[in-house]
């Protein structure tokens, strides 16, 4: 699982991919502003190997009174149904905040191919902000 967003200092193919990810990230940021009045403004999307969106999620812990109602979990649930599989080796999740330890563990279990996030979470981040669960990966 890779979780580093490459900057524009790479070859043209990588810059093209980054541009696509930037468009999705901007979409997520717009959506997070809409939900920020009711929930923690975290949104996630999952792209398949062709770059098509197969799952979307927003935080719904307060609305649903659900401790598992994190954006990443919601996106995984939707994508699992659409993909009809629990393995996401070739997929990418994009989220505006580093996934917490629970969500990071779920992404590891789902064998997510790439994780792109907008900011580290120094309090609860599971991919380097607070703790790095990816260091103990067994799924490659």
What do these predicted regions represent?
Residues 17-37:
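Short, basic/aromatic recognition patches
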Residues 42-47:
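Short beta-strand scaffold segments in enzyme catalytic cores
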Residues 54-61:
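Short beta->alpha transition motifs characteristic of CBS
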Residues 63-74:
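A short, polar/charged loop-to-alpha-helix boundary motif
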Residues 85-97:
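Immediate flanking context of iron-sulfur cluster ligation sites
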Residues 96-113:
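Local cysteine-cluster metal-coordination motifs and their immediate loop/turn environment
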Residues 119-120:
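Short secondary-structure boundary segments
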Residues 138-140:
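Conserved small/polar residues in nucleotide/adenosyl-binding loops
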């Amino acid at each position: 699982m890779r979780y580093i967003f490459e900057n524009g200092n790479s070859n043209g193919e990588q810059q093209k991919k980054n541009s696509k990810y930037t468009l999705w990230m901007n979409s997520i940021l717009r959506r997070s502003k809409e939900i920020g009045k009711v929930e923690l403004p975290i949104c996630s999307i999952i792209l398949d190997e062709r770059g098509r969106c197969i799952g979307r999620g927003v935080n719904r812990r307060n609305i649903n009174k659900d401790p598992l109602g994190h954006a990443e979990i919601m996106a995984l649930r939707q994508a699992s149904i659409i993909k009809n599989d629990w393995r996401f080796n070739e997929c990418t999740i994009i989220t505006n905040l580093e996934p917490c330890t629970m969500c990071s563990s779920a992404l590891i279990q789902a064998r997510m191919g790439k994780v792109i996030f907008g900011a580290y979470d120094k309090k609860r981040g599971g991919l380097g902000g607070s703790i790095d669960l990816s260091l103990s990966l067994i799924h490659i």
